[in-house]
């Protein structure tokens, strides 16, 4: 099987590379699936993130029609606060609003991973509880000025400057980054890829 990552995220690419544990025979391609990420009316966060991961994997599979036996990995990450999905910010003001909402509180990060081939799609969902320290307006302004939050669900990246705001996590660190390693390895192992 030929492994394909249906994402152009540098964070997901780096994490998937780790799964190979440095083996030269662990390789993968990347494609950029284009899907509608709009939540459906009444859709629960768990259902939403799993649907997007599956749709990304299926859209990636469609982009690999010229490849022999593709196995496509799709993933999506959301931040949930009081059952509200906090996606990527639309502008600086939105990022600041989200960071103020997260300040001093716990929230859930959900990452779904789907592995699709021509016959089957397998799925894993991982949830991690993240608690933020209290953020000052100066912290929020400086962080947003760095532009780091602008392409990240929940307006922060735990692996970057945003990690300074994380008081504690209960669960998978790699889930918060965007690709839960243990569960992704399980999917790849079950499919005979590793």
From Swiss-Prot:
This is dTTP/UTP pyrophosphatase. Nucleoside triphosphate pyrophosphatase that hydrolyzes dTTP and UTP. May have a dual role in cell division arrest and in preventing the incorporation of modified nucleotides into cellular nucleic acids. GO terms for molecular function: dTTP diphosphatase activity; nucleoside triphosphate diphosphatase activity; UTP diphosphatase activity. GO terms for cellular component: cytoplasm. Its cofactor is a divalent metal cation. The active site is at 76 (proton acceptor). Keywords: Cytoplasm, Hydrolase, Nucleotide metabolism. Transmembrane segments: none annotated. It catalyses: dTTP + H2O = dTMP + diphosphate + H(+); UTP + H2O = UMP + diphosphate + H(+). SUPFAM superfamilies: ITPase-like. HAMAP family: Maf (MF_00528). Belongs to the Maf family. YhdE subfamily. It is an enzyme of class 3 (hydrolase). It is found in: Cytoplasm. It holds the Pfam family Maf. Its EC number is 3.6.1.9. One of its GO terms (biological process) is nucleotide metabolic process. PANTHER family: BIFUNCTIONAL DTTP/UTP PYROPHOSPHATASE/METHYLTRANSFERASE PROTEIN-RELATED, BIFUNCTIONAL DTTP_UTP PYROPHOSPHATASE_METHYLTRANSFERASE PROTEIN-RELATED. Its main location: cytoplasm. The keyword Mitochondrion does not apply. The record marks 11, 77, 159 as: Important for substrate specificity.
